[in-house]
Amino acid sequence: MAHAARLLAALAALLAAAATGDARPSKIAVVGAGIGGSAVAHFLQQHFGPRVQIDVFEKGTVGGRLATISVNKQHYESGAASFHSLSLHMQGFVKQLGLRHRREVGGRSAIFNGENFVLEETDWYLLNLFRLWWHYGISFLRLQMWVEEVMEKFMRIYKYQAHGYAFSGVEELLYSLGESAFVNMTQRSVAESLLQVGVTQRFIDDVVSAVLRASYGQSAAMPAFAGAMSLAGAQGSLWSVEGGNKLVCSGLLKLTKANVIHATVTTVTLQPTEGKPLYRVRYENEAGTGSDNYDIVVIATPLHLDNSSTIAFEGFDPPIDVVQGSFQPTIVSLVHGYLNSSYFGFPDPKLFPFANILTTDFPTFFCALDNICPVNISASFRRKQPQEAAVWRVQSPQPLLRSQLKTLFRSYYSVQTAEWQAHPVHSPHTPLPRFTLHDQLFHLNALEWAASSVEVTAVAAKNVALLAFNRWYQDLDKIDQKDLMHKVKTEL
């Protein structure tokens, strides 16, 4: 099936070239080898064919925000840890690359407010529903209906992309999915939207805020669209990749036969040419500096004012604008040690029943605490008992102080940290950026200013690949079209 899809994509490229008389691009540059850069390299090759040279520039490690840390001779996820069951692009990558889903190891969750647990999961589904109803009435049902309505509309993007449609800006993409309602959700808070559909303030404070803190490190004041995507992840079944999620990135680059250049891109310059534009990409690494010309350039890394490594754009009139915003720092600490269950109200550690702890607005020094499993799980693997030394993943807005570590752990063997600029600080006042920066210069990460997740980035990668393809062959009927639900129903 995958081979047939690649064959059809290559045939489509040949037909488009024949129809327009345009040759395919000879060289494409992708800046960034995270999931966005890896996925867009794969999609670009699907559309333009295998003869196009694709150079992928990466200043760090392939995988970006998909990464692992070794603790006691085992590897654990330190970046994006899991994916929603409806992550169709990620599901497709895993299947195409011959990877496997990691075996699930069950564990109960709870929400902590700094003094006690406001909500505790049990092993019985009906009892969990009863507790939600007893504490919050039907707020959880109203939340579920609201999230499902958003997700049902968002899932339209896969059908649009299957028919070759692309969007030059984030606002155009959102409008195609949910019209003005989706665009307005980027300008209105989660709390405001949920109160409007009858969710209680108490449920927002206790449950919704805890989920948003764990996923985004932000509050219910964040925009509703990003919040809905985050809350969808909390409701669906989750999965991860056996051996580590970053294998998807390295696998896609290997499948694409992309030329990975370990270097920092410093400048993209528009070259004076006749006809289609040409872009000169300058870069530097330990070997020195270099540059090359490209027909298409995709920036698959954040571009915003607070980013000290933002690329300089030269020769463009008007100048290239970067996003007027900042990113939310998230510290992930992997602690190998003994949990201080007394802090959570369990003097006897043997009685502590939870593997995952979310927090409300208090305590402020950590957002979530998880007893995590390694990326490779054997058939005989079992989760550590609460009285045993285990590897705990602590998410916090700042590096944990020694006193804070002593609050959470009776003792510990090691602490290893990863600091991420994990997500944009989502604000109703941040304007929605565009994917198209210039004729054949694109910013893949534009979409994460509306919502940020691995699958959303993969959706953006597919959109940018289609956008580049459609613009190259001037197939403008496939760009920024409205009423697409009607159009795709009438297409063969």
Swiss-Prot record:
Pfam families linked to this entry: NAD_binding_8, Prenylcys_lyase
Paired cysteines (S-S): none
Any one GO CC term of the record: extracellular region
Location, primary (coarse class): secreted
Signal peptide (residue range): 1-21
One Gene Ontology biological process: prenylated protein catabolic process
The organism's place on the tree of life at top rank: Eukaryota
Positions glycosylated per UniProt: 340
EC number: 1.8.3.-
Cofactor: FAD
Subcellular location: Secreted
Keyword Cell membrane: no
The entry's keywords: FAD, Flavoprotein, Glycoprotein, Oxidoreductase, Secreted, Signal
GO molecular function, one term: prenylcysteine oxidase activity
Entry keyword Signal: yes
Family: Belongs to the prenylcysteine oxidase family.
Role noted for this protein: Likely to have oxidoreductase activity. Required in the mevalonate pathway to regulate prenylation and enhances the bactericidal activity of neutrophils.
Protein's recorded name: Prenylcysteine oxidase 1-like
